[in-house]
Regions:
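N-terminal, polar/Ser/Thr-rich
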Residues: 19-59, 86, 143-149, 457-458
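Amphipathic alpha-helical substructures
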Residues: 276, 399-477, 481
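Beta-strand-rich binding/interaction modules
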Residues: 84-90, 192, 456-457, 472, ...
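Juxtacatalytic substrate-recognition/specificity segment
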Residues: 181, 208-211, 229-333, 337-346, ...
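Surface-exposed beta-strand/loop patches in extracellular or lumenal glycoproteins
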Residues: 61-82, 166-171, 175-186, 442, ...
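Acidic/His/Gly-enriched intrinsically disordered linker/tail segments
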Residues: 215, 347, 351-409, 416, ...
Length: 538
């Protein structure tokens, strides 16, 4: 879905420092918007890919249907420069094109008129990049299972879907009418992709075509393939189809481990609304890398263990109460797949909310106390290396702190609001209001401001644009206490709760010193409820 992108200018020192990073023409071509991109809206991808496992090679065709939104004779489609373009056809004729890094500028030699719907056929081939450590670096993973059969996957978030198929590789545009994915692979293997299975057809020369269809809009990086000796089992839950594809050798383990899907769905649908891609169903697919939120075909590689490969990211032991990959990657169906950021600089919209869903699931199943310990335990993973929001227009993500700090920011805002009924309604309404939309940070802040009837903008700005946490300062003046906030943003008045002599009191500090009306004998009498507010104290 093509949306007009809105950029928020922030004159903070940290953003200015970030802007001093060096970006190239290649970065701008990938991350930026220009007339060759904004002049058309992708309506549908019809992708056919033949994979040769032995050669680690593919031959592909993507039929790209698009609507012209501005008169143009040139459009930009993306395909990594190591991949060969065999031809690009329009109405049966070959088109001229120019390549610049991974961008392909296609010249129609005539003006495409605004309002028309057009289609090109993009034929390509080559050996796609092989990932060194998927999913953290993008590419294909060619391995074998225990029985020596090919086991193949691909993950490209951050790197770009154009690593393996031609597309308009920008988060600002998703195919409005979905996609078809046809996988031509050697006989004896199963090909799995997004959406609904539409049947398989045995071809000549030892190959079979596996056909899949997605009805909903879908992120480019969510379109994927899985190839392996899969067995399939299925279930239903509240009218939602649940499908599972796992290696033959792991069926027994999967039938036990995947029982967590139903209580997860109960929790997430209660808190965030109905599963957003019911028409396409929900799938878990075993893969040869840790995991990825591929829409309606979630990649699962957690080795059938609780926690994160058997470890607890929070060091509280509560992270071992659930399968991290099932919960986290499925949470992305609401936050990241249904609600998508326009620019990767705003990826906290995906990762901060989804990291928070882990604590939400714990709270649903095991109670608020365990959830609170878990989310606070995640703070140990924060690096404070750079701001959460990256640089716009150059395919630049911010700090990985978008996960844990982003989740703790939401936890803090929940306690600022101080009304759980209102908080859960806000989260639910947020997921529904922006369902299947592409948004930016400005839209998120505006929504929470409106629904909370509070000005949360300074809080969002401090956590998202700066590495420093809000610092609460105290000083004792004779028998009285004074307190204030120290922050990077100019105006900051976040309320906070303290305990003093067994009583819970809400303070409303600003950046100016304020006098605490109760007498105290020592600063040690004050306990700031840090488990509810992610802050520093001095």
């Amino acid at each position: 879905m093509l949306k007009k992108i809105l950029l928020t200018i922030c004159l903070s020192a940290s953003i200015i420092a970030l802007a001093q990073e060096t970006f190239t023409r290649k970065d701008t071509l990938f991350g930026g918007l220009r007339p060759e991109r904004t002049s058309f809206d992708v309506m549908r991808y019809d992708l056919t890919v033949k994979v040769l496992p032995k050669e680690k090679k593919m031959y592909g065709l993507n039929e790209i249907t698009f609507k012209v939104v501005e008169n143009t004779n040139i459009i930009q489609i993306d395909l990594f420069e190591n991949m060969k373009i065999d031809s690009i056809k329009f109405k049966g004729f070959k088109l001229e094109y120019k390549r610049e890094f991974n961008a392909v500028f296609i010249d129609f030699a005539e003006t495409l008129s605004m309002g028309n719907t057009e289609k090109i056929a993009f034929y390509y081939s080559g050996n796609p990049i092989i990932a060194k450590r998927a999913p953290w670096d993008g590419g294909f993973v060619f391995t074998k299972d225990k029985n020596g059969k090919d086991f193949i996957g691909v993950a490209v978030q951050g790197t770009g879907a154009s690593l393996w198929y031609p597309c308009k590789d920008s988060q600002t545009d998703e195919p409005n009418l979905g996609a078809t994915i046809k996988l031509i692979i050697p006989d004896g293997l199963v090909g799995v992709s997004n959406g609904r299975f539409k049947g398989s057809e045995k071809l000549k020369n030892g190959f079979t075509r596996w056909n899949w269809e997605v009805k909903n809009p879908i992120n480019n990086y969510d379109i994927t393939l899985y190839i392996g000796d899969y067995i399939h089992f299925s279930d239903k839950h509240g009218g939602l189809d649940l499908d599972y594809y796992v290696l033959r050798e792991n069926e027994a383990k999967a039938r036990i481990q995947f029982q967590e899907v139903k209580p997860m769905m109960d929790c997430f649908q209660a808190k965030f609304g109905p599963y957003p891609f019911k028409e396409d169903g929900y799938k878990l697919v075993e893969t040869n890398y840790l995991g990825m939120e591929h829409q309606s075909a979630v990649a699962y590689g957690n080795q059938y263990k609780k926690g994160y490969l058997g470890t607890d990211l929070s060091s509280t032991n509560f992270g071992l109460l659930f399968d991290f990959i099932i919960i986290h990657e499925s949470g992305h169906e609401w936050f990241g797949n249904s609600i998508t950021s326009k620019d990767v600089a705003d990826m906290w919209i995906h990762e901060g909310f989804t990291c928070y869903t882990e604590a939400v699931y714990l709270e649903c199943k095991y109670g608020a106390t365990k959830a609170k310990y878990y989310i606070n335990g995640l703070a140990q993973n924060i690096q404070a290396d750079k701001p959460i929001i990256g640089q716009y227009g150059v395919a630049n993500e911010g700090s990985s702190d978008m996960y844990y700090k982003g989740a703790l920011m939401l936890h803090t805002i929940r306690n600022v609001i101080n009304n759980d009924e209102r908080w859960w309604k806000m989260l639910y309404d947020y997921a529904q209001h922006f369902k299947h939309q592409i948004i930016d940070t400005e839209a998120v802040i505006a929504f929470f401001n409106q629904e909370s009837k509070l000005d949360l903008t300074p809080i969002f700005n401090q956590y998202l644009h700066y590495t420093n946490l809000p610092k609460l300062e105290f000083k004792k003046v004779q028998s009285h206490l004074e307190y204030r906030w120290v922050t990077d943003v100019d105006f900051f008045d976040m309320p906070i709760d303290i305990m003093i002599r067994g009583n819970k009191i809400r303070l409303c500090p600003t950046k100016e010193w304020q006098l605490f009306e109760h007498k105290i004998n020592a600063l040690q009498e004050i306990e700031v409820l840090k488990q509810d507010f992610f802050i520093d104290i001095n």
